[in-house]
Amino acid sequence: MTTPDAGGAPGGGLLVRAVRVVAVDRPTPDGEVDLRLRGGVVTEVGVGLAAAGDEQVLDGEGRWAIPGLWDKHVHLTQWALQASRIDTSGTTSAEDVLTLVRARVAADAGAGELSSGGGRTAYPLLQGYGHRTATWLREPTVAELDAVSAGRPVVLVSGDAHHGWLNSRALQLFGLAPREGVVAEDEWFPIFARLGEYAGSPQAVEAAVRSAVAAAHARGIVGIVDVEWGDAPAQWQARYAGGLRSLRVRAGVYADRLDTTLAAGRATGDLLVPGFPLVEMGPLKVISDGSLNTRTAFCHEPYVDAVPGAADDGRGAPNLSSADLAELMRRAREGGLQVAVHAIGDAALDAALDAFAASGAAGSIEHAQLISPSAPARMAALGLTASVQPAHLWDDREAITRCWPDRDERCYAFRSLLSAGVPLALGSDAPVSPLDPWLAIAAAVHRSPDARSAWRPEQSLTLREALAASVDGQGTLRVGSRADLVLVEADPLGGDGLGGGDHTAYLRRMPCA
């Protein structure tokens, strides 16, 4: 449940009876207690509290109470569109994907000229999501996708969202030049941002967003940092006007909207809807390098499987120069914006730290999938947060074995970061991994989703640490805590006697009341 800072529960407040407070970061009272929520905060913790006349009463029935959970890196509209896309996540080759596309085209043949939104269009766009080419034996081609799509435009988004596999009709639709292979990185992101335009009517897309928010609430989510492409602040202002008011949101922008954001005088933390405290301005998001899957993450050393003679020396490449990055961040700082820098390769991370130091900006490193030995101490000294997505390590395990086997001890190094004093914030990067905080927690604690042993277990977090990294710094519920809380049916810190696989399953099915 989420209660605004101004207004609280209808009728003036809420008394939650008979809950067991989970000790996230400090000891808690023994046994069941009552929590009084008023004005957006916890105002009293005790046993047998008397209900005030204007309070609603909720019986917790002995459930466990934790602070509301957050996902610190989401592309919410793209996540909402997943239900209508072909799921290519289980594929291991181009042939596997082509089989799925061929089957979907055949199944949809009866749709004729009907678009997914019910309007009339000659070529309804078919979308898919989830394949990862890093472990494929060859790269996919436009021609082979043409051969199975029967003249229908097709866009297949990679599992890391850093490239799109388009057929010729889709290339024409988006005004791109013919080519043999995929569309990647800077050329790709504007296309990715527009996919919602072809997923049905605006009303249908927003209905999908509402369904995604409801599903997130059911998993205990009370807040997200939404770094959706396009104008996320305007999207959330419109959603507020349309009645979507149950989720805390920090809406970020990208460099293409920095000028208009600064001109509007918006700083990180400013309310996007006057008088409504749940929707705030978020950070400036900067994508400084690429991804592991596309082999565009910027590294100090070449990828082990790099193609000889590659234009980037097999190390990936930065998306902007060090000087341009520092200048962008300086402008953001002067305008009151924090900066969230996407940095996956170790060279990209070190360059981002240089830019933070030069610009004086505050904020976070997003992903930090491969870190240099000096990075944790530098991040701590700069006061930066590591915004990490633990479920990605489950997806990237084979790719790292192929691309970075000589440096895997520095991949997803959560323990190294935390031990150096770097605050961690867990997220999903949905749709790259599902918007499910319990999945992220399970992956951070048990670095294997299956019967295999944990991958680099020395970098695991404890369950308490992972939970603490998922609650937006709120810690154990107490007087003065934000009045966002989740009641769960089982002890989230329990299950210690279970084996790795069983404990992972225990966390992933955590039932929220």
What are these regions (language model features)?
Residues H75, L278-T296, L382-L393:
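Non-cysteine beta-strand/loop elements that form the S-adenosyl-L-methionine
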Residues S168, P233, Q237, L349-A357, ...:
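Histidine/acidic-residue-rich catalytic or RNA/ligand-binding cores of hydrolases
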Residues F356-A362, R378-S387, A420-P423, V445:
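Glycine-enriched alpha-helix->loop->beta-strand junction motifs that scaffold or abut catalytic
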Residues N167, G220, M281, G290, ...:
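Conserved, mostly hydrophobic/aromatic
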Residues G11-R38, V42-R266, N293-A348, A362, ...:
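Divalent metal-binding segments
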Residues L247-G282, G363-Q369, P373, A399-P423:
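Phosphate/diphosphate-binding loops
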